[in-house]
């Protein structure tokens, strides 16, 4: 059963206005979206974005004229806001950056190290290179880099060596094969957490270009949101959280220039318009972690736009 992470905290943070316009940039199974819709009146509007065809197929099955589904990447959020004439008029945007329940449970998607299935890992399995294609063709240097940088895995050399030795004999086709290789490389060193956790995260992030997608979206969201509008993020690992935290802090404090640097006064004034009001991060309650284990690594950050650029 799908349980949306930190649902009450999201609704409180996004501060819904009944006739407002909102964007759920990561629709997934629609748990957060359904709750947002329930708070809107007949004049309210909810745009939902997802690059997973199955998620958007589900969104399209919801018969509600207030709901506008978009199949695409949230990095194009500015383009969508212009197309649907909501640029600068959005009262709230939600980014729930975790995998959806359906993606984890569907063994054919290849996201989970707990279920055997084809090694795919694409958010949109109609486009792009699969994890299977990449893992069987990338050189050892690239595999090491991805597992180290995107998984923060300290045994990246051991894992990449085992992978490259094995594929000389046969291709790696399934999640189970990859899990077994990672176990062989470093399983002994992991007692509490699954040894494949970090490597699967790393490969998924690389295959879907997740961090770059997030950075591209962050470049535009302040322009899209209206004054007093809220931006809410839920992240599940430190790489995403650091990017989000840096974005919020950089847009909520004054820029300081070196003394006597030749910069126009108008630029200094413009750069020192505070764009965001930063709120303290929120983590799931002990009670939520007990009934929804997926939430244990979640961090919610949110900010409010103070004025136009």
From Swiss-Prot:
Residue positions binding S-adenosyl-L-methionine: 30-32, 50, 74, 96, 103
Record-level GO BP terms: rRNA base methylation
Enzyme Commission numbers on file: 2.1.1.199
Any one GO molecular function term: rRNA (cytosine-N4-)-methyltransferase activity
Origin superkingdom: Bacteria
Compartment(s) of residence: Cytoplasm
A single GO cellular-component term on record: cytoplasm
Keyword field: Cytoplasm, Methyltransferase, rRNA processing, S-adenosyl-L-methionine, Transferase
SUPFAM superfamilies in the record: Putative methyltransferase TM0872, insert domain (SSF81799), S-adenosyl-L-methionine-dependent methyltransferases (SSF53335)
InterPro entries in alphabetical order: RsmH, SAM-dep_MeTrfase_MraW_recog, SAM-dependent_MTases_sf
Family: Belongs to the methyltransferase superfamily. RsmH family.
Protein name in the entry: Ribosomal RNA small subunit methyltransferase H
Species in which this protein is naturally found: Wigglesworthia glossinidia brevipalpis
């Amino acid at each position: 059963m799908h349980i949306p992470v930190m649902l009450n905290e999201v609704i409180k943070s996004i501060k819904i206005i009944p006739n407002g316009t909102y964007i759920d940039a990561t629709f997934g199974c629609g748990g957060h979206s359904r709750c947002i819709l329930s708070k809107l009146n007949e004049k309210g509007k909810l745009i939902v974005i997802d690059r997973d065809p199955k998620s958007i197929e589900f969104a399209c099955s919801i018969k509600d004229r207030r709901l506008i589904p978009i199949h695409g990447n949230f990095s194009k959020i500015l383009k969508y806001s212009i197309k649907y004439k909501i640029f600068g008029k959005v009262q709230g945007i939600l980014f729930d950056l975790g995998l959806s329940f359906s993606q984890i449970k569907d063994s054919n998607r290849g996201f989970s190290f707990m279920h055997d299935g084809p090694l795919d890992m694409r958010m949109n399995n109609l486009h792009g290179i699969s994890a299977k294609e990449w893992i069987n063709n990338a050189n050892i240097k690239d595999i090491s880099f991805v597992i180290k940088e995107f998984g923060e895995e300290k045994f990246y050399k051991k894992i990449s060596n085992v992978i490259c030795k094995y594929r000389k004999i046969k291709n790696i086709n399934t999640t189970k094969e990859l899990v077994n290789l990672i176990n062989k490389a470093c399983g002994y060193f992991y007692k509490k957490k699954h040894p494949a956790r970090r490597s699967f995260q790393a490969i998924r992030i690389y295959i879907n270009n997740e961090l770059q997608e997030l950075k591209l979206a962050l470049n535009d969201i302040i322009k899209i949101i209206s004054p007093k509008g809220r931006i809410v993020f839920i992240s599940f690992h430190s790489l995403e959280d650091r990017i989000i935290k840096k974005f919020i802090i950089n847009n909520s404090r004054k820029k300081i220039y070196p003394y006597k640097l030749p910069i126009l006064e108008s630029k200094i004034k413009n750069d020192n318009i505070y764009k965001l009001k930063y709120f303290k991060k929120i983590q799931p309650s002990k009670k939520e972690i007990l009934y929804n284990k997926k939430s244990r690594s979640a961090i919610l950050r949110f900010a409010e736009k103070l004025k136009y650029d």
